[in-house]
Structure formats: C-alpha cells, structure tokens
C-alpha cells in the first residue's frame, strides 16, 4: 500500500513536469496559462524564416 501511494505520487509529479505545470501555476490558477515563467526574458519573437534559411544551407 505504501509503495503504491509512493508510485502514484511520483507519477503525478512526473506528469506535472512533463506537461509544464509548476508550483507557481498550481498556486495561482487565475494566472495566464500561456504566459511563460519569464515574460520579459526575450521580447523579440524568433524569426522562423531566418531559422529555416540557416537550416537549409548545410542541407542543400
């Protein structure tokens, strides 16, 4: 019984990490779920066209 509870708790923690749920998100359910943990970290979006162009160069 004790091992089953420990296994279920470990699986729950693993799934929270796998799906990106943090303790802050669980503590504040009204927070924006799409906002990252550091919204001011990178104000410029990634230019996917430039990334694709750089990736195509070595591939031909």
Swiss-Prot record:
GO terms for molecular function: toxin activity. Residues 1-27 form the signal peptide. It comes from Vespa bicolor. Expressed by the venom gland. One of its GO terms (biological process) is defense response to bacterium. It comes from the Eukaryota. The lineage of its organism: Eukaryota, Metazoa, Ecdysozoa, Arthropoda, Hexapoda. AXPX repeats lie at residues 27-30, 31-34, 35-38, 41-44. Residues 28-45 form a propeptide. This is Mastoparan-VB2. One of its GO terms (cellular component) is membrane. Antimicrobial peptide. Shows activity against both Gram-positive and -negative bacteria, as well against fungi. Also promotes moderate mast cell degranulation. Does not show hemolytic activity on rabbit and human erythrocytes. Its mast cell degranulation activity may be related to the activation of G-protein coupled receptors in mast cells as well as interaction with other proteins located in cell endosomal membranes in the mast cells. The modification Leucine amide is found at residue 59.
